[in-house]
Amino acid sequence: NVIRNISEKEGHDWRLMSAIAYHESRFTPDITSRSGAKGLMQIMPSVARQFDVPAGDMANPETNIWLANKLMSKIKSTLRFPAGTSDKDRMSIILACYNSGIGHVNDARRLARVNGEDPNSWEVVARYLQLKAQPEYYESEAVKCGRFTGSRQTLAYVNDVIGRYDKYCRIARR
């Protein structure tokens, strides 16, 4: 299994990466979204550029999976969770970044911090992602990426991928 081999080599749980692939493309390698995301893992061209991968190579399943793993690693290292953060909170916040971009999630985390709440709690971050559609939140000095109207889709994405990951964990060993 290509997803398993690449994910294990890159230090990620192949079952999570498979859950992402299922949600993103239903394992269809030659799909392109309306927004320009490509392949099994629905990678944006800007991500390919970050990792010096030519746009023409993005549809290659192995390259696409490798890019998704690299993106997950970059998100994880950028977020710098403290030691006490639960695995579920960590995974949910990382998946939200994968789906909506790290900027909106970081805005939600900054809003949580400014309001005295836990920026490492998915429940809190999810609430602030939703609130970023309202001017009193997206006009805050803590917000760098402006208004966010995609929270419903992002929250559904996180729930769906984690639900599928949980199923994969029940039926397949790591």
What are these regions (language model features)?
Residues T28-I31, P82:
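A short, acidic/glycine-rich surface segment
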Residues N1-E8, P29-D30:
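N-terminal export signals and maturation junctions of secreted/periplasmic proteins
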Residues H12-M17, Y22, S35-K38, R90, ...:
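Extracytoplasmic
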Residues I31-Q50, V114, W122:
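Short, surface-exposed glycine/acidic/tryptophan-bearing loops
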Residues A19, Q42, I94-C97:
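Soluble periplasmic/extracytoplasmic beta-strand elements of cell-envelope proteins
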Residues V2, E10, R49-T63, L67-K70, ...:
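Non-catalytic cell-wall polysaccharide-engagement segments
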